[in-house]
């Protein structure tokens, strides 16, 4: 019964979005994003979650610019990058021998590969090519201002979402 109520609420929220001028524009942007790519389960899942979160937020006119901006960011990212970003609450802490300076514990380089190896291990990924892709994704997420690494030599390091990373995370998480 609860599942039926959830479906009915989701349908009503979508109906509200589609009958609102600004909401309709956002829904159509998501539909266009889906049609621009071959079917991909992760891509579909992330856009489904974003659509649900937009529809649940209501206030389409007030939040239009924010939604439009974040959908634009999502559109530029790979499904794999979105999956890693959406998994932020499960990112492991990690160790590595950092040789360099940090400002306030913020590390700017050398952490991508050590994190990626620990993250891949946690996800039972052993394929070196997939791990290399994770390294590339983590580097992109850092360079685009979605994540930062914090820690000090001799302690555990951790990745954290920036303000912009948190903004996207809200679209990708249930």
Specify the residue positions occupied by each region the protein language model found:
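Long, helix-rich, hydrophobic modules that act as membrane-proximal anchors or helical bundle/coiled-coil regulators
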Residues: 37, 41-174
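Charge-rich, amphipathic alpha-helical segments
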Residues: 1-58
């Amino acid at each position: 019964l609860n599942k039926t109520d959830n479906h009915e609420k989701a349908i009503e929220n979508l109906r509200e979005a589609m009958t609102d001028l600004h909401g309709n524009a956002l829904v159509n942007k998501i539909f266009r994003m889906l049609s621009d790519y071959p079917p991909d389960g992760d891509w579909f899942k992330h856009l489904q979650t974003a659509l649900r979160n937009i529809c649940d937020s209501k206030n389409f006119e007030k939040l239009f610019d924010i939604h439009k901006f974040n959908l634009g960011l999502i559109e530029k990212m790979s499904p794999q990058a979105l999956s890693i970003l959406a998994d932020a609450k499960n990112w492991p802490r990690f160790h590595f021998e950092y040789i360099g300076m940090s400002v306030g514990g913020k590390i700017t380089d050398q952490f991508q590969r050590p994190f990626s190896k620990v993250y891949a291990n946690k996800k039972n990924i052993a394929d070196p090519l997939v791990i290399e892709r994770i390294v590339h994704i983590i580097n992109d997420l850092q360079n685009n201002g979605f994540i930062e690494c914090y820690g000090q030599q001799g302690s555990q390091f951790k990745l954290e979402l920036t303000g912009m990373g948190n903004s996207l995370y809200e679209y990708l998480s249930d």
